[in-house]
Structure formats: C-alpha cells, structure tokens
C-alpha cells in the first residue's frame, strides 16, 4: 500500500505510473461476518451495538470484471445503511449478497462469508476493466452508490427503475469503507478539487438522495419561490435539502429538535425555523391515535413564515411520526416526497386531505447516474458544501457507526482509509479559500 499512497501523494505520478503499480494481494476492510448475524437476537434496535459486529479484516483483492474499476480509497463515510448492515436490520444484508451471487458467474464474487460495507468514497483509480473508456488509472474520483445491470428496458428511462438496481456497499460487496473498493465505472465522478479527501467523500449518498427527492423531475421538481418543509433540516440528509432549497431560490421551512440545530440552519442561511421540541408539537396522543389539532397548530405556525401560504413541497423522511402532519400542511396540488421512515414504516394519514386536495405522494430512493452527477457538480462548483462534522480512523469505524446509530452526530461523519491524516487532497486552494467557512460549518459540532 505504501507505493500506492506515495504515488497519490506525489501529485506527479502519471496514469502509466499508476497502471504499473503492483496491486497488493490483500487490503484492510471494514466487514461484518455471516456467522454473526444472530448475535443481537432478542435485543431492541437501540441496544444493538455496531462496535461488536464491525471488524477490520485483511481481505483478498477482488477480481476485476468488465466495466469495473478498482479504486484506492483515501476516505469514506458512514451512512445509516452501514448501521443497518452492522445490526442486521431490517434483514441481514447477506440475503442481498446471496441473491446477487445467483445472477451471473461474475456476480458470484459478491456472495462471501464477509460483507465489506460502505457506500461512499473518495480516492484514485488503480485499474479499469475491459470496456472502460472514460476513466483511467490515476484519476481522482468520488463514487455514487447506484449499481445497475441495465439488461432490462425498464431501467433505460430512469436507471433507478432497473430491476437489478442495487446499492453498492449495502446490497453488493466490496464497499467503500476499505483501502481498496470495487465499483462499476458508471459510479465514478470527478472529485471536487477544492475539497480534501474526507470532505469529498462525505456528500455522496445523502447529497444525491436529496437532489433526486427535492430537485429532480423524478422527485418534487422544486422551483423558485416554492415553500419547502424540511424535516430534520440540520441532519445528514436534511442539511443538503436545506442547501438545495436556498441555492434554488425556494423558501425552506426548517424543522429541528434543538436550538443548536436551529443555529446550524441559520448558519446555512435559513430564516424560517421551527424547533419542534421547544414549541411542544406532539402529533400523536398515544401510540395509536394522532392529534389533528396539532396538525392545525403546526400549519398555522408554518403560515407565519410564508405570508399565509401553505407548503408546496414536504421533504419527508421521519415517516410514521410526522407523515400525517406532512399530508395535512401541504397545499392543494402540492407534493410530499419521502425517502425513508426513520420513526416507523407504517404511515397513517387522513386520506381526505390527500385526494380531495389533489396532493401527491412520491417515493424517492437514492438517485440515477445523471442526478448523482449533477449533485456532485454543484459540490464541485462550490454551490453545495459538505456537512462533515467529525472524522474517524478506519480502526474506529465501529465507534463511528455507533455514534450514527445513537444519533450522537451532526451532518456526516467521515472515515480515513489510506489517507494518513485529514486535510490532504486539496488541488484548488483559491476556490477552497472562497468557501472555507461553509466547508467547515459542521466541524466539531
């Protein structure tokens, strides 16, 4: 690995130099083990500890197939899907690997007794397989996490509809929390040159998800002047939605749960902020009964920020706890987009407020290559910024996943892989200086 790292840090190594570097036989990777999938049986979700299931193992370098690339990973980050993998909820991801392994002789590589996790990376291309023309060894890249086969016509209008669509590092093996990762070449995008490795790795999954859900025509299709209600507006997902709304000329109404989180939203430029804890909103009387009076009180509060207008778009991801209120406060003809259900999957709402007011509910999941590319392009232009708050070593990934699981973080948490320290990889210092305050906005919160 030293030769690879030396070539990356030299900034003078050519593509031919990288192509000539010998690949190691093995590399360090964050894994979960198939023989431990029952280790948390009988425990509540909260009591399942990723630090017990996550391992740092030496694993063999995978075979490189057509249309693929091996990437030296300088940094990665932790998403909720890595937490789900580590606590084996809602199902063991080894089920995904087994199913993928049955697809073809090549995909059998993924069905292993260990799962290398992680759905973000920033690094350098080491090798490309047959049929890869747009990328070469030595290219500095980030990767989005959509893995598709595109052998069915269903995926050719929107690749997220490919029947064989999977999330890399969650539903496939050889993910980004490792020193080397295996990706398809159509996952690669240029690394933003004003960001360090760990900063560039952080936006990936959540930035692309927020872009599709809020901006893309496959999501809400946000336009200038729209009133956008954003739940968890300072979090890993909501913080990107807040930035997209502000950059796109919309009016974000940011819902948070503390004054500290309200301050984060203000630092991004948001003015309309609702601290749901301070204002005492309780949308459920008990576990089975919602409180429409609270919906109405919430809607009245929103209209104080919008000049009496209702919400055009709701950026939903809490799910069960908030969904009834989300449907209620949306204007006639408005849109509720949802990409998750962190408070519960079984949603309840009064359907009269949906059908009689011609509202729409849109399910949104990650992003296609074009959407991920556009989201990354905005980061590269300095229009959207990383929300990196803390960085861990590869050895401490279990602690990073634990902190995300227990919601002890803000924004995104990063993980250094091959990068020996933070702050490396910046190629455009002038652009960085223009945006340094925004880049560091979430640091050490």
Swiss-Prot record:
Inhibited by NADPH at concentrations above 200 uM, by MgCl (30%), by ZnCl(2) (55%), and by CoCl, MnCl and CaCl (100%). Also inhibited by iodoacetamide, N-ethylmaleamide, the thiol group inhibitor beta-chloromercuribenzoate, palmitoyl-CoA and myristoyl-CoA. It comes from the Bacteria. Its EC number is 1.3.1.86. Keywords: Metal-binding, NADP, Oxidoreductase, Zinc. InterPro entries: ADH-like_C, ADH-like_N, Crot_CoA_red, GroES-like_sf, NAD(P)-bd_dom_sf, PKS_ER, Zinc-ADH_QOR/CCCR. Optimum temperature 40 degrees Celsius. Pfam families: ADH_N, ADH_zinc_N. Zn(2+) binds at residue 149. GO terms for molecular function: crotonyl-CoA reductase activity; metal ion binding; NADP binding. It catalyses: butanoyl-CoA + NADP(+) = (2E)-butenoyl-CoA + NADPH + H(+). Optimum pH is 6.5. Its cofactor is Zn(2+). GO terms for biological process: fatty acid metabolic process. Catalyzes the conversion of crotonyl-CoA to butyryl-CoA. It uses only NADP as electron donor. May have a role in providing butyryl-CoA as a starter unit for straight-chain fatty acid biosynthesis. Homodimer. Belongs to the zinc-containing alcohol dehydrogenase family. Crotonyl-CoA carboxylase/reductase subfamily. This is Crotonyl-CoA reductase.
């Amino acid at each position: 690995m030293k030769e690879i790292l030396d070539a990356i840090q030299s900034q003078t190594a050519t593509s031919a130099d990288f192509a000539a570097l010998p690949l190691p036989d093995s590399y360090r990777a964050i894994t979960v083990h198939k023989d431990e999938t029952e280790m948390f049986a009988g425990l509540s979700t909260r009591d399942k500890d990723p630090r017990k299931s996550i391992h740092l193992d030496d694993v063999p370098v995978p075979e490189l197939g057509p249309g693929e690339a091996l990437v030296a990973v300088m940094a990665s980050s932790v998403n909720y899907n890595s937490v789900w993998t580590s606590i084996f909820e809602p199902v063991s991801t080894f089920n995904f690997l087994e199913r993928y392994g049955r697809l073809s002789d090549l995909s059998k590589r993924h069905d292993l007794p260990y799962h290398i996790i992680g759905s973000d990376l920033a690094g350098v291309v080491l090798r490309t397989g047959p049929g890869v023309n747009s990328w070469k060894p030595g290219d500095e890249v980030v990767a989005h996490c959509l893995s598709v086969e595109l052998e069915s016509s269903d995926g050719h209008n929107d690749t997220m509809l490919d029947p064989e669509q999977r999330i890399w590092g969650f539903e496939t093996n050889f993910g980004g929390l490792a020193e080397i990762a295996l990706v398809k070449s159509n996952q690669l995008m240029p690394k933003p040159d004003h960001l360090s490795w760990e900063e560039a790795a952080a936006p990936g999954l959540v930035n692309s998800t927020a872009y599709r859900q809020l901006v893309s025509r496959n999501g809400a299709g946000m336009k200038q002047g729209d009133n956008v209600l954003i739940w968890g507006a300072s979090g890993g997902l909501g913080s990107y939605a807040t930035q997209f709304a502000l950059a796109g000329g919309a009016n974000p109404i940011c819902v948070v749960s503390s004054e500290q989180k309200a301050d984060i939203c203000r630092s991004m430029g948001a003015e309309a902020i609702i601290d749901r804890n301070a204002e005492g909103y309780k949308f459920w009387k008990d576990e089975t009964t919602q409180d429409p009076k609270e919906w109405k009180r919430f809607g009245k509060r929103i209209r104080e920020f919008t000049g009496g207008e209702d919400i055009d778009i709701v950026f939903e991801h809490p799910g069960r706890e908030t969904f009834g209120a989300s449907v209620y406060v949306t204007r006639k003809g408005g849109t509720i987009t949802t990409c998750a259900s962190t408070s519960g999957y079984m949603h309840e709402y009064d359907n009269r407020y949906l059908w009689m007011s011609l509202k729409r509910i849109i399910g949104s999941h990650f992003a296609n290559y074009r959407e991920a590319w556009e989201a990354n392009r905005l980061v590269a232009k300095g229009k959207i910024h990383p929300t990196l708050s803390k960085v861990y070593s590869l050895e401490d990934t279990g602690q990073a996943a634990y902190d995300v699981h227990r919601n002890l973080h803000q924004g995104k948490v990063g993980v250094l892989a091959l990068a020996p320290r933070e702050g490396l990889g910046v190629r455009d210092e002038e652009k960085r200086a223009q945006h340094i305050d925004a880049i560091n906005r979430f640091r050490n919160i």
